[in-house]
């Protein structure tokens, strides 16, 4: 049996050559550098179509794209030192000691342009949000910050991990607005087969006690390990007992054939007896060890 990094590289290349061939046959023009794909398109929609096709091709080999590195962007124009200098100047404070909406609009506009010019790197947006968080902003400014960042997070999914700390909790966003965002994020992520986005939608739903009206278990059995686990925690919280049973049966099947890839999903939802075939894991379960924070179990 061949083992080792060289064998892994060979197998990866064999798989990706097949993926390349199918993408070329579909009419896409791209370059692959080891496992990084670069595709130049004329429109945003064509770029989205390429990403969807790549996701589907990789899925057929039980592989997935790295969502944090997946982005649609313009050519880079601005260096990091330049954007830090630009965003290091905070928006002007108005005569009443608060930052008014006009200044906030201009500041976030700069941050967005810099992000787009720097390979879609979320660092400028995160930096800008931190700066705004430290300022006394007007009510209109706060509403604009929240609405703008939530809108951007749908367009640029790599902003989603910032939302809990820098938007929802920082600005005490209303449950209705969070509910609306979760619904959009969930539906959009399902369409794009972005299971990281689905996982975040489920996490926000659990954390803020907001049920997703369009929740459908059928779409989630194809998700990755974390998506499956959060689906189970969501079903447990909101009393979807049939879906819970479906996921438990799914975990039992995965334990037989694909434990290593889905171990945390399998471990967390099966009991000690059901894990008996996995000695170490059964012992950990017997000791009450969990990898999930108690407030989310």
Where are the language model's segments positioned?
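Short proline/glycine- and acidic-rich turn/helix-capping motifs at secondary-structure junctions
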Residues: 68-80
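Short, low-order "capping/linker" segments at domain edges
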Residues: 79-93
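Conserved polymerase palm-domain catalytic core
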Residues: 1-33, 38-53, 57, 61-63, ...
């Amino acid at each position: 049996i061949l083992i080792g990094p060289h064998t892994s590289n060979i197998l990866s290349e064999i798989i990706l050559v097949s993926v390349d061939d199918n993408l070329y046959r579909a009419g896409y023009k791209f370059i692959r550098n080891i496992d990084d794909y670069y595709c130049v398109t004329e429109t945003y929609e064509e770029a989205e179509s390429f990403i969807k096709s790549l996701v589907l091709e990789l899925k057929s080999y039980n592989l997935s794209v790295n969502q944090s590195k997946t982005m649609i962007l313009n050519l880079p124009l601005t260096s990091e030192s330049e954007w830090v200098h630009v965003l290091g100047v905070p928006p002007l404070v108005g005569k009443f000691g608060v930052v008014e909406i006009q200044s906030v609009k201009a500041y976030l506009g700069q941050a967005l342009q810099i992000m787009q010019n720097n390979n879609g790197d979320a660092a400028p947006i995160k930096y800008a949000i931190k700066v705004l968080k430290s300022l006394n902003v007007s009510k209109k400014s706060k509403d604009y910050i929240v609405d703008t960042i939530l809108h951007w997070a749908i367009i640029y999914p790599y902003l989603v991990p910032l939302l809990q700390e820098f938007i929802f909790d920082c600005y005490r966003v209303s449950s209705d607005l969070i509910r609306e965002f979760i619904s959009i994020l969930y539906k959009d992520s399902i369409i794009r087969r972005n299971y990281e986005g689905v996982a975040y939608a489920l996490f926000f739903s659990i954390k803020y006690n907001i049920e997703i009206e369009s929740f459908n278990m059928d779409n989630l059995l194809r998700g990755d390990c974390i998506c499956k686990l959060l689906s189970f925690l969501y079903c447990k919280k909101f009393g979807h007992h049939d879906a819970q049973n479906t996921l438990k049966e799914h975990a039992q099947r995965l334990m037989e054939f694909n434990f290593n890839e889905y171990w945390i999903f399998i471990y967390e939802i099966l009991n000690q007896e059901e894990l008996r075939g996995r000695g170490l894991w059964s012992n950990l379960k017997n000791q009450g060890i969990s990898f999930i924070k108690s407030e989310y179990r």
